[in-house]
UniProtKB/Swiss-Prot annotation:
Function in brief: GTPase that plays an essential role in the late steps of ribosome biogenesis.
Entries under InterPro entries matching the protein: G_ENGA (IPR031166), GTP-bd (IPR006073), GTPase_Der (IPR016484), KH_dom-like (IPR032859), KH_dom-like_a/b (IPR015946), P-loop_NTPase (IPR027417), Small_GTP-bd (IPR005225)
GO biological process: ribosome biogenesis
Domain EngA-type G: 5-169, 178-351
Residue ranges of domain KH-like in the record: 352-439
Protein name: GTPase Der
PANTHER family named in the record: GTPASE DER
Binding-site residues for GTP 2, renumbered to this chain: 184-191, 231-235, 296-299
Binding site for GTP 1: 11-18, 58-62, 121-124
Keyword DNA damage: no
Coiled-coil intervals, chain numbering: none
Subunit and interaction comment: Associates with the 50S ribosomal subunit.
Amino acid sequence: MTHLPKLAIVGRPNVGKSALFNRICKQKIAIVDEAEGITRDRLYAEGELFGLHFQVIDTGGINARSKEVFNEEIKRQAEIAIEEADTIVQVVDAHVGLTELDKEVARVLLRTKKPVCLAVNKIDNLSQTSLMHQFHSLGIKQMIPVSAAQGWQIAELLETAFEKISREIESQETFSSIKVAIVGRANVGKSSLVNYLLDEDRCIVSPIPGTTRDSVDISFTHKDECYTLIDTAGIRRKRAEHEVVDKFAAIRTERAIERADLCVLMLDVQEGITAQDKKIANTIEEAGQGCIILLNKWDLVQGFRMEHCLQNLEEEVPFLRHCPKIFTSAKTGRNIDKLFPLIQEVYANSQKRITTHQLNKFIGEALQKNHPPMIQGKRLRIYYMAQVAVKPPKFILFVNYPNLMTDTYKKYLYNQFREAYAFTGVPILIHLKGKTKKDKPVSSLSLTRKQTKSTDQENNEYDELYQEQRVSDEDYYFENEEDLTEK
């Protein structure tokens, strides 16, 4: 597995650590705000400088005097980052000047005997470098003036930080990992799950909602398979969105869902299905993501009955009926061993392809079992079906007139398709396409016999057809059996 050199960014609160982290990573990962204590967990991302790839770790502000409820946890997270880092950058604020907290942080870093570089932040040009002199007393020999906001001197800072780090740490081995977003409303146990899976306190765990504010990416290996867990900030009720940070965190959670390969939706069975749970479930569905549902804390409910919980879940979020469910306790690890096989299964299903030959055989058998009904003397005719995309699996069903497809028959086809191909944990998108000049009417019952060309030839021809045809007013689609709408 790749072992990249690690750079930890540390310092007192509100000196620009997260802004520097984002600048090095060249993307907005950490939430940046003027308020103190925004970053709480350790954030990891990959950076690159002149061909050298490395990991960057953003930490919360170290403040021994703070009364902030999470201060001890933030400090511990920073200490863990310092321990695992190969090189360290302490960030200070040139305009605020040297503070006692800066001195305390420097003393801690120098005791590690690791390479330490001082980033004197908020210096926009060389004319302001005189502001650096006050920091010489910290005892850190390597000092670089930088502007995280403007991107000035960032390359020079990184060169200095990695000057004494051997490139032998870095392996050129590449690997692909399955990105799994751990999502759910605030305080359902997401960080407890991540910490149990990793067997370390990577994320701050607290009964106070909103503990995790950033989306924390964590890469690791389990049974020779590579995974990246994305521990997201819980989406809270709207009344809490007066905090700008919580609003940013909710947006970051939605982005995490979009960039993940699949999602693990955590629910608290003690409180049942809430409006926030439904909102997150809808976000997963709209993103077309595969999903596994973890029903957490069921061991804390007296007289708990699984069948009642599953029935309630199906009634509240019927569009996730296809998703596998696990009753678990993230705190004790009960049934967590079932999660990884399901991740592999759902991920494989999201990329599964079915040949046009197999799909047309399926359509022929479905039509033989149950013919479409007559509508005003006309009957729906299905010409053929083909898959056009994966993640999520997407299919086009070519018919004579889409408006002849009744709701009952839509449900029938959907259920038959699920029964034939399962696609456990993955949404299925099936689009209806109206008749075009290129479609020759054929008997719907002859679909299983019309095999005059190879499957590969059919797939190539149909792929070209989809690219040429434009979506018309007659196009319809349905996602799962209950969500068929006109486009």
